[in-house]
Amino acid sequence: MSDLSDIRREYTQGGLRRANLPVNPMDLFEQWMQQAKDAQLSDPTAMCVATVDEDGQPFQRIVLLKKFDDNGFVFFTNLESRKAKQIATNSKISLLFPWHPLERQVAVLGEAEPLSMLDVAKYFMSRPKDSQIAAWVSKQSSKISARQALEGKFAEMKAKFAQGEVPLPKFWGGYLVRPASIEFWQGGEHRLHDRFIYTKTDADWNIDRLAP
């Protein structure tokens, strides 16, 4: 077994104070997302999406956030994928944005609900054509014999859709994650990190500081 106990560093980039927090957590998320983009982080919209199967086994994967507003967080996926099947069984979901260079992370707990076909189609048509074709090619999470089979299918579908628009696959869609809570974590000196959690109420958000 490899001993990794000596890998550590101090967090020095600043703290997070209650007096500076906005009432709406999405305002703080927007600010942090913009700062992650301004810092030119690699894939600032990348988030770890956790779902649970019918046996209670959790699964995680990296997915790109495509939109957010006061309603929540939006991502798109193959509806035959493992994550989509798990969401159909249990809509509870967790998102994590790991912005390590900024010594920050944001954790979201909530429920996922399917997007309308209009919203899905609108986003699908905005994708590069090769990405649209790739959506037709991959039966996500299924076992394949070799990469060559995937590449061959891509070439076949690229020829099929060479002219005109690529239609929206029936098995492709998206989700809105409506947050029940959003936790903001900022690294602090001596491991005295700052953690604030926003919890949704019927009318507003409660804000609490958590011990690091």
UniProtKB/Swiss-Prot annotation:
Q: Which residues form a coiled coil?
A: none
| InterPro entries xrefs | Pyridox_Oxase, Pyridox_Oxase_CS, Pyridox_Oxase_N, Pyridoxamine_oxidase_dimer_C, Split_barrel_FMN-bd
* Pfam families, per database record: PNP_phzG_C, PNPOx_N
Q: Which cysteines are joined by disulfide bonds?
A: none
Pathway the protein acts in: Cofactor metabolism; pyridoxal 5'-phosphate salvage; pyridoxal 5'-phosphate from pyridoxamine 5'-phosphate: step 1/1; Cofactor metabolism; pyridoxal 5'-phosphate salvage; pyridoxal 5'-phosphate from pyridoxine 5'-phosphate: step 1/1
Describe the reaction catalysed, as an equation.
pyridoxamine 5'-phosphate + O2 + H2O = pyridoxal 5'-phosphate + H2O2 + NH4(+); pyridoxine 5'-phosphate + O2 = pyridoxal 5'-phosphate + H2O2
Q: Does the keyword Transit peptide apply?
A: no
Cofactor dependence is on: FMN
Output the superkingdom of the source species: Bacteria
Task: Give UniProt keywords alphabetically.
Answer: Flavoprotein, FMN, Oxidoreductase, Pyridoxine biosynthesis
Q: How is the cofactor bound?
A: Binds 1 FMN per subunit.
Q: What class of enzyme is it?
A: oxidoreductase
* UniProt: substrate binding residues: R8, R9, E10, Y11, K66, Y123, R127, S131, R191, L192, H193
Q: EC number(s)?
A: 1.4.3.5
Residues engaged in binding FMN: 61-66, 76-77, 82-83, 105, 140-141, 185, 195
Signal peptide positions on this chain: none
Any single GO molecular-function term of the entry would be: pyridoxamine phosphate oxidase activity
Q: Any keyword Oxidoreductase?
A: yes
Which terms under GO biological process does the entry name?
A: pyridoxine biosynthetic process
Described purpose of this protein according to its UniProt entry = Catalyzes the oxidation of either pyridoxine 5'-phosphate (PNP) or pyridoxamine 5'-phosphate (PMP) into pyridoxal 5'-phosphate (PLP).
**Which PANTHER family would you find in this protein's record?**
PYRIDOXINE-5'-PHOSPHATE OXIDASE, PYRIDOXINE-5-PHOSPHATE OXIDASE
Per the record, the similarity remark reads: Belongs to the pyridoxamine 5'-phosphate oxidase family.
Subunit comment: Homodimer.
Protein name as annotated? Pyridoxine/pyridoxamine 5'-phosphate oxidase
Give the gene that encodes this protein.
pdxH
